[in-house]
Amino acid sequence: MTTLLKFRKDQKLKGNKYSLNAILMQAISKAFKTFPNSNCSYKDNGEFFINDHHNIGIAVDSKFGLKMPVIKKINDLSLKQINSNLNDKINLTRDNKLTPSDLSDGVISISNLGSFNIRSFDAIILPGQTYILAVGQIFEDVFVDKGKIEIGSIINLTLSCDHRAVDGVLASQFLSSIVQNMEIISDDK
């Protein structure tokens, strides 16, 4: 998390305020590129297919209830564009102006409860999607790195998946790739 937090701090000084969720979306999209078979869907009629685009949802609380708007074709967007589209979807959600299209075609959604001081939790997959990524609070903790005691920022991520669409090995590789991608951040597509 150290690299990610430094990136956000440096970008904020340049006038770019990137949310953790936007960075996670980019990391997920890069993981889909590394493991294209993980970008899959299973429909109740038994149909299984690999998706061409990276469509990622986000849990948004509003006075109208919890909604999961989807940012579509993230694989075609830079981090700045992802961040902008994410902010737009959040505002549409809070203004109760989402269309049915805004809520459809997601493969994975992010549920981030870090702002509620929750370090770890399990989230339930939205019907029709393959995954949900539960994101906990960023916190400092002690850990050992190469035999040396360090203090660093840590975040817990929990990936739940529909095993009809993806097996545990591929899901584990996908999650590991997301974690690695969170430390390799750029504004590239």
Task: Kindly label every feature range from the protein language model.
Residues 1-189:
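C-terminal catalytic/motor cores of large multi-domain enzyme assemblies
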